[in-house]
Each structure stands twice: as structure tokens, then as C-alpha cells.
């Protein structure tokens, strides 16, 4: 019988959990306090930057959410790098792309709903798309078969199922975004906000599953 695999890097695991947990708490807070301003069905998470919290903007809080998730992901990246497993470089590059994309999304706002596309808005959209593709790709590379005593092997099936769900959600969100561009916001048929929140939930669950062996 194989002995249980030791924790890869408890310090990185705790930092990752802290960052991811903070991001989740902030996202719940934004949903609760801005439910009357931003539709969770039709509007994306990024549009919380235009919400109002009392006399102030919700943009700083949204930025902190993105930065916290990015920090947690960087900690996961560092923990995986410490494992020194085959394929680590590719996984770290993809997680780096995911983390950088989150950073850009937190600093560069999306275009307001119904307004003309701006360069900043396009940068935000491209960063978000790249990030959401990079994370499940990293998960698939991390759980590639043929790696003996890999800390992530016991969770391989779960990680891959979540990564598949993430890719599927990205496809739906991207398809809905293209339809909205073609038909216009007034004729929007796909509930982008709802599917993006599903994608966010899947990706957070995926991150937490990937973090577990670090602890």
C-alpha cells in the first residue's frame, strides 16, 4: 500500500486559501449589496465596478477581489513550482497567465453596458478570456497521466471534470458575448451574467481542489 503523499508546501497552501477565500467573501458581499444595481442574471461580474456603495464607488472593492484571487493563484503557482514535477514549467506559465489576466481585470475596467467599445474595455475582455482559458488548461497539464507519486494524482478525475466544466462555461459565455455584439444588448438571448457566475464558481472550486495537495 502506498503511503499518503506529504503536503507539498503548507505555507503556499495557506496563502492560496487566504487569497481565494477573501475573493469569495468580497464577491458574495458585492452580490448582496449591489443586487438592485447589477443584475446577476444579465450583467457580468466586471460591471460591479459601476455600482455604488453608499457615497462611494464599488470599483475599489472589485479590484481587491481580483487582486486577492490573483495573489492566491500566484501562491498556488509557487507551491506547484516547489513540487519540481515533470511539466511544472508549463503549468506555472499557464497559471501565470491566469494570474496576470486577473490583475488586468482588476485594474482596467470593462466598458459600461450599452456604451461604445473602448481600448481599455477591449483589453479587459481579452485579459478575462485569456485567463479563463489558461486556468483549465493548467489543470489538464497538471494532471497529465504517467506521473508517479504526483501529489495531484488522487484528485485527477475531479480536477479534470472541473476543468472540462470550466472550458464548457467559457464556450457558452464567449458564444453569448458574440451574439450580443451581433444582435445588440436589446436582443440579448444568453444570460451572460448567470453563466459567468457559474464559470466563476467552477473556477474557484477548481482552484481549491488544486490547492489541497499543498496543505
Regions found by a protein language model. Name each.
Residues 7-33:
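N-terminal signal-anchor transmembrane alpha helix
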Residues 101-152:
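Membrane-proximal helix-loop-helix units in multi-pass membrane proteins
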